[in-house]
């Protein structure tokens, strides 16, 4: 009996032994952040268990606190889904595996804004800036509130308010963004990036055959873009070559609902399809055909492929991104703006072009990755890289003594980046990193085909090699920055980057008039950055004020000896391979009665450029030191079912030596953007009016060749009206552009051996097109 009692007691103890383990609760901690990495309070978190029967069960709930943190305690381990939902963002769902005890902290980034969101950020809340995005002049534009710049046609994917986009021809030739007082015709002082995860992937092409710093926005399918961020360019250590006057960063969506879009008019047809194979991925394809709206038919073909996949592996968030693009077309070119000019008596009317032989062919392939490793709640390590191929063959006639020219190249570009972020405390965040980039244009050629034979306008004839180069530009860049609160009402940002640049130029064409100009040179560039901000109390009725300083640079085109100096008749000596600038910026912003106001004042001084290469003619000229002053005022008002954004800029850019205005730099820019989400008959509308004032174009025009040539102002009103049908499964829309003026305005000499210049540009046609979008799968109620 006694032995029986003991045996039962042993069995009972054995059965009770696992109970402490069973009683050990499961603790899941996490943090929710916005697209900038800032804490996102008020997000709703749910842990959902999926049963085979289809009856889902909510196991736990939590709400993120002011610091974005949340804690959920559960009873049972297993594979579940975590869902995060925050106002203004698309819900995020992630499959996780729970184990007993404390699980690794979950980092949730709400990267994709809700399609219902109707906000355009024009004021910089200094409290939201961080060590990765420190510029108080930064503006983030939500894709849903922007208009396609040219729906179904080539060019920039979106129109950015206050930053006109122009090109000196039509067709697939890549347009470039302009900034107040900046003649950024070929992207030289304006940087363009693609946000692959948290990696800033450069889209500029240094020493491009057509123009130094050339960037091609044609590679994007507009539907994959979530946002566009613009900043001053010179005030962030992460932004390097070509980030002088402006940096524009395209943000990508995390997924696409399955769709098919057809856009067309009486001359063009565009088809786009996209879907998401998994919640954190997308595939998109586009095919575009057409002739444009100018008299010279384009015979355009474009094919695009954009794809992205995001993986969550433990504490890693890995983003893979790829692009494939091919395009070709004829490119209607510059024509005289003022037809009454007597020099136009012999001008051949060839249909919106001076030379029907002008054409362009471009193809590129790109792969990139970004790995964000969350070491702890406050520490993060990023590893990134990319590889790209690019080809260009562009035939242009800009009226030089060379006539029709061909600018061609094939290049490879590759790069890598590593950076470490540690937010030690509110008063100190540390960023340290290293970037590497190598661009290798091969057969960077300039050839001449001579002048147009009017009796046989399709004849090209033999070409004459003018110049050819093999170029390698490599940079090794360490950088460091610190950011935080100095006191209750002040914040600071201090940064430094040092670029060690290796430039290797192999001259492939040597003649007595064009001696061999091969060289190899190392150049070191230091770029300090600093921003100090004042954050008053709301009750003080004072604006947020920030003062910034930054030094920036762009690498010069290393090709030299390509032409003669202007007027002197002797070759121009090679200049410095790097041009530097010093920028100062004052930003004041405040919100009054739900209306955001921002004023930005800027002052930029730039070094002289000797032997600068004209991207249109291949000729060399000296460009003296310059000074730019500008003021931009932005006002935004959000309404319940819409928004208004007005931007006005005045600028004055001049050559220090001569005091003359910088040719082709816009001095006045006005932009008004409006959206309306709910109109009668369930219509939705967006409209934008843009005005670019008369620009100085240089000297040489009649009747006084010594006076400043001027062009004409440009006025554009673009709009889109859409209506959903079939429970938002089908959307029909009309896009239109009402325009007057000429884009790409410059001066040109049409005939050889003449010094008289004429104001020329590309006529901007008005048009309308129809868009139909069909969405597959489940749809949400309106």
Residue positions per predicted region:
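Short acidic/polar hinge/loop motifs at secondary-structure boundaries
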Residues: 198-232, 250-251
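C-terminal beta-signal and adjacent terminal beta-strands/loops
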Residues: 696-698, 723-782
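Gram-negative outer-membrane beta-barrel transporters
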Residues: 485-492, 500-501, 596-607, 621-700
